[in-house]
């Protein structure tokens, strides 16, 4: 039974890398019958944003990754952190350091000049027989943890395998600032231990933090969880993903017309696979996912793949679901007479809900202008006479407008009898009915709109001579 978590900082939006990590954590917890927790790491009070915090919660609600229990906020747990800092001080596993910023800057400069790795030199670290400097007046100390100075810090990573770090690389890092505020690596270790985390799945940019956190676990006698460090998502050129490439707010994907299932399907495949399978239901993800099978190398973001997946999900979900989704884009088809027919038609061509809306409104909205290039190419001197004759044909076949097949049945002889090619009739009709030349089949449009609406739109186009006013 795995207990996992996702722990974002509310200093910016939730991007897809974070969502992928949370998805992996969610799947593993649910698959094993464990718990998936959400923790907000908001100790950086100066950079916290209420808007970002809300966006994180909204994103989880939208994609349907339901977390267990209450949301943990680190800013509300400072008393707990202080208790453990005091415990470390009492046990001798942490100590007070009174070095000033100027002294630390001078130390760093000297080490860099000597081509040494900058690190704390242990001036205030208590050792048997060592005499510490006198405590300066009026200086509030920081608290440093006593890291091991010899040996190695090792752990088995579920993705990267056995990891080994020289202990002297960790340094006696600060676990509490001079104002008493605890630091990131300390509070993460405390929270993961107290929340009972068994498995920590996170980006491999956190790999260097892990030995620092293990020092805290060991100093307090906590059990070290299983770590899985997931490689980054790169752009197609193998570089860091930028906003232009797709590293944007998760909620931007909603605004761009992606379905949450498609986005999750896309993300689960960015670093994990099951043979050549591309489309996964949530049920299949839960059955098949195992974090030990996450790829060791970075994945590549493919926007075309995401669009393809989204188009497949748009075709697959129910029309009732699409009607609800389209309300977000200010289109309500609830009371439209042929809502199912128009959705069945439009969703075959749409890659996003934005495109779906446009495909629908191109048909149901009366055109306010006509595509100039289409008018120039397809509207001829005899077009008016041709469309008037076709309207008479529609009128005489009003009772046959209830199926696409019947409309096709009486239209094809009309085209042949008048010596026409299909575009000579259909493109002027498309322009008159939708304003453009890229709409779906004319038979489908006629079926959806019905005689009265077709009569009105064609006559309006003829009245305006297909000109924009």
Swiss-Prot record:
Keyword field contains Aminoacyl-tRNA synthetase = yes
Q: Which reaction does it catalyse?
A: tRNA(Glu) + L-glutamate + ATP = L-glutamyl-tRNA(Glu) + AMP + diphosphate
Enumerate the subcellular locations listed in this protein's record, separating them with semicolons. Answer: Cytoplasm
**InterPro entries given in the database record:** aa-tRNA-synth_I_cd-bd, aa-tRNA-synth_I_codon-bd_sub2, aa-tRNA-synth_I_CS, aa_tRNA-synth_I_cd-bd_sf, Glu-tRNA-ligase_bac/mito, Glu/Gln-tRNA-synth, Glu/Gln-tRNA-synth_Ib_cat-dom, GluQ/Sye
One GO biological process from the UniProt record? Answer: glutamyl-tRNA aminoacylation
Q: Where are the transmembrane segments?
A: none
Q: Which Gene3D superfamilies match?
A: 1.10.10.350, HUPs
SUPFAM superfamilies referenced in this protein's UniProt entry, alphabetically:
An anticodon-binding domain of class I aminoacyl-tRNA synthetases, Nucleotidylyl transferase
Subunit and interaction comment: Monomer.
Briefly, what is this protein's role?
Catalyzes the attachment of glutamate to tRNA(Glu) in a two-step reaction: glutamate is first activated by ATP to form Glu-AMP and then transferred to the acceptor end of tRNA(Glu).
What name appears for this protein in its UniProt entry? Glutamate--tRNA ligase 1
Query: What organism does the record attribute this protein to?
Result: Aliarcobacter butzleri (strain RM4018)
